[in-house]
């Protein structure tokens, strides 16, 4: 029997089940996944044409001429390009997704910089109204209950399938975010997942004052603990971890991946340490009970909280109160600030935010269940034996982390003048409008356009992750050049603005249908490496390096909750910009490195705000054109 037939045999018994909202629906996830289309390999000539178009606004004419020669060589009939393309097409036939394994390895597991700042995004939640330990623990208990409620939907396979433009999306990432952890390796990391099977996780990790605890979250009959029960258990944890002089073992996870891999092997030589680390790795998720940060005024409150979510503030604050390899860590501080940080390898932002939206809604519900009064066992404290060698590893990690913390400049801008409803009223895609404002802000600051990355979801395809929307286009470049030019009328500028937003929308649609260029080019390059042939000159060209040097790395992560995701820049002289467009306002998080003299997050925020307002006034002053 071939693979397809086998799958069909497996799928048949469940084919009659009606998807119900409640109860277990075993096999539903599998069935849904198998019905999804495979990621296509785009036509070679199409990608090469689009690559040249993408280069036009960001490189000189001279460089472009040189690249055109390389492209002409690469695309010759029977040439290198065609050979690699055939290899990719063969790979696509043999696998569920020709890209996903390669992408996981190259983008995440083989990436050697620390996950902190360089890879793991944070999310800032609205400030909660508690100011003390009691409120902190009560909120944490409710939050855990919300996580377990979501976990039940995942376990029972009753999670509602998401759709985009009427097409069902791959739901696989939801099954990867709980009970999973990244493990450091000397050249490449790996991911472990304990969500399924007999050894399914029944506990979470709680960290307080750098001390880790194993907290069982299910009763012996399999029912999840209630908020009251969880609150009692969290109080026990709090009261048995009051010492503030403990070695912050968790800080080891903030180091460069190769250094951490060495320290990890070192740490695990001891049996007690190994058991403690395995318990953390197997847990459903981590809850970090943080000490309050220094007080700041309300108007800038969100910016230090964003930093807090991304890195914990450094070794004297809460960075030791984490295990950064854990996929999901929820952070709740005594002063009401809260959010999460997640390890990026298993999932993108949207599934994380969907989980978050669910939890936030859940925490608002009144408590109905009376808790059973059975006394619960004391949560187990995870012990670590710290040898002088481990102590020295911790000290080195602290120093490196503190340098990173000092270097990261992050600002949360809440743009209050309008939200996504305004561009919609002008029949413009809100995302295209915001991206064009970023282009305008950057152009006004630096006098030229730069390579811009916006993530596009490939979840219409089985195991799809992301591709790149290149927001810098010939059309966007024309618009930003014209915006402050006295030679153009408002009408002409408004027409260029509409053309640029239309071009962005078209590129977005192309990308989500698997027709963007970035992953295809990466695939051709990796195919060459796999075939052990020399890397084609096209990929050794300066233009390729410029195209891949994303001074603007951006992502729209919409949420029902009034939150904002944040991440660090992907190049030393760049910006990391994430935004959540709400109806009447837009939340932005903007990051840059202090070590780069040319970038400044506050300056970018200022120019971005001005760009958004100027684009609105332009549209209001020019009547709608006949485009």
From Swiss-Prot:
Any GO CC annotation of this UniProt entry: mitochondrial inner membrane
Chain residues in the propeptide: 1-30
Keyword Membrane recorded: yes
EC annotation from Swiss-Prot or TrEMBL: 2.3.1.137, 2.3.1.7
BP terms from Gene Ontology: carnitine metabolic process, CoA-linked; fatty acid beta-oxidation using acyl-CoA oxidase; medium-chain fatty acid metabolic process; short-chain fatty acid metabolic process
SUPFAM superfamilies hit by this protein: CoA-dependent acyltransferases
Annotated (R)-carnitine binding sites: 453, 455, 466
Active-site annotation: 344
Domain of life, source organism: Eukaryota
Gene3D superfamilies to which the protein is assigned, alphabetical: Chloramphenicol acetyltransferase-like domain (3.30.559.10), Choline/Carnitine o-acyltransferase, domain 2 (3.30.559.70)
Binding annotation for CoA: 420, 424-431, 457, 556
InterPro entries to which the protein is assigned, alphabetical: Carn_acyl_trans, CAT-like_dom_sf, Cho/carn_acyl_trans, Cho/carn_acyl_trans_2
A GO MF label: carnitine O-octanoyltransferase activity
Membrane topology: Peripheral membrane protein
Keywords from the UniProt entry: Acetylation, Acyltransferase, Endoplasmic reticulum, Fatty acid metabolism, Lipid metabolism, Membrane, Mitochondrion, Mitochondrion inner membrane, Peroxisome, Transferase, Transport
Subunit structure comment from the entry: Monomer.
Protein name from the UniProt record: Carnitine O-acetyltransferase
Gene source species: Columba livia (Rock dove)
Record gene name: CRAT
